[in-house]
Curated annotation (Swiss-Prot):
Belongs to the short-chain dehydrogenases/reductases (SDR) family. Converts 3-phenylpropionate-dihydrodiol (PP-dihydrodiol) and cinnamic acid-dihydrodiol (CI-dihydrodiol) into 3-(2,3-dihydroxylphenyl)propanoic acid (DHPP) and 2,3-dihydroxicinnamic acid (DHCI), respectively. SUPFAM superfamilies: NAD(P)-binding Rossmann-fold domains. Gene3D superfamilies: NAD(P)-binding Rossmann-like Domain. NCBIfam families: 3PPDhyd_Dh_HcaB, PRK06200.1. Its EC number is 1.3.1.87. One of its GO terms (biological process) is 3-phenylpropionate catabolic process. It catalyses: 3-(cis-5,6-dihydroxycyclohexa-1,3-dien-1-yl)propanoate + NAD(+) = 3-(2,3-dihydroxyphenyl)propanoate + NADH + H(+); (2E)-3-(cis-5,6-dihydroxycyclohexa-1,3-dien-1-yl)prop-2-enoate + NAD(+) = (2E)-3-(2,3-dihydroxyphenyl)prop-2-enoate + NADH + H(+). It is an enzyme of class 1 (oxidoreductase). It comes from the Bacteria. This is 3-phenylpropionate-dihydrodiol/cinnamic acid-dihydrodiol dehydrogenase. The keyword Cell membrane does not apply. The gene is hcaB. It comes from Escherichia coli O8 (strain IAI1).
Length: 270
């Protein structure tokens, strides 16, 4: 039996991409899974696909009341909450400082930080009492942009660096009751969109990046799928497998940190 059997897991942005892969994986692990999802169509799809195995709540991660409504439903359904996974986010399609108009930069900043940073903070606030009670955990999705430049423009990169600070501070404030960690995936097949303020709300990440382009920059030389990143979340959520980690960011970057100066990888001819 899985360590996560009957554990109550709350994931934001579970309707597509990494969020959907996390929903699938935690259901496979036997967990009771809930998600807060902005898209009504994706909520309907989740309910149709997973039936009684999913509690799908339509709502916005920038709205505390929506979080509270979701947590109330989770506690009614499961009687507890063991892990909150803040995952919903938006990207800026590498919008640069020089090429972004000042007024767009300002509105884009507020929209992107509201989702990527405030959304995590509001989720933590809504989930904290239940997680303190269960001595559970929080996990936040980061990005390779939390470590390196070039994984987005200045707005996205700054938001992911801000999220690392949030993780450390929450890990400090909530210890010893709640473990707080992060996972930073690299580029993957995803429906990740951009801010409406930048005119990117209908543009997905795969319209800006090709599988070949992503694979070429990774030392492991493959195009990651969302399911490739779910393992670290499962480990961090498990009390048996993670008793000791808090304030830790797992850099799941397919080897970006070890790219060579002369070659992406030294073993390409092996």
């Amino acid at each position: 039996m899985s360590d996560l059997h009957n554990e109550s897991i709350f994931i934001t942005g579970g309707g597509s991409g990494l969020g959907l892969a996390l929903v699938e994986r935690f259901i496979e692990e036997g967990a009771q899974v809930a998600t807060l999802e902005l898209s009504a169509a994706k909520v309907a799809s989740l309910r149709q696909r997973f039936g009684e195995h999913i509690l799908a709540v339509e709502g916005n991660v920038t709205c505390y009341a929506d979080y509270q409504r979701a947590v109330d439903q989770i506690l009614t359904r499961s009687g507890k909450l063991d892990c909150f996974i803040g995952n919903a986010g938006i990207w800026d399609h590498n919008a640069s400082l020089v090429n972004t108009p000042a007024e767009t930069l300002e509105t884009g900043f507020h929209e992107l930080f509201n989702v990527n940073v405030l959304g995590y903070l509001l989720g933590a606030k809504a989930c904290a009492p239940a997680l303190i009670s269960s001595e559970g955990s929080m996990i936040f999705t980061l990005s390779n942009a939390a470590w390196y430049p070039g994984g987005g423009g200045p707005l996205y990169t700054a938001s992911k660096h801000a999220a690392t600070g949030l993780i450390r501070q929450l890990a400090y404030e909530l210890a010893p009751k709640v473990r707080v960690n992060g996972v930073g995936p690299c580029g993957m097949a995803s429906d990740l969109r951009g801010p409406q303020a930048l005119g990117q709300s209908e543009t997905s990440i795969m319209q800006s990046l090709t599988p070949e382009k992503i694979a070429a920059i990774l030392p492991l030389q493959f195009f990651p799928q969302p399911a490739d990143f779910t393992g670290p979340y499962v480990m961090l959520a498990s009390r048996r497998n993670n008793r000791a980690l808090s304030g830790v960011m797992i850099n799941a970057d397919a080897g970006l940190a070890i790219r060579g100066i002369r070659h992406v990888a030294a073993g390409l001819d092996l």
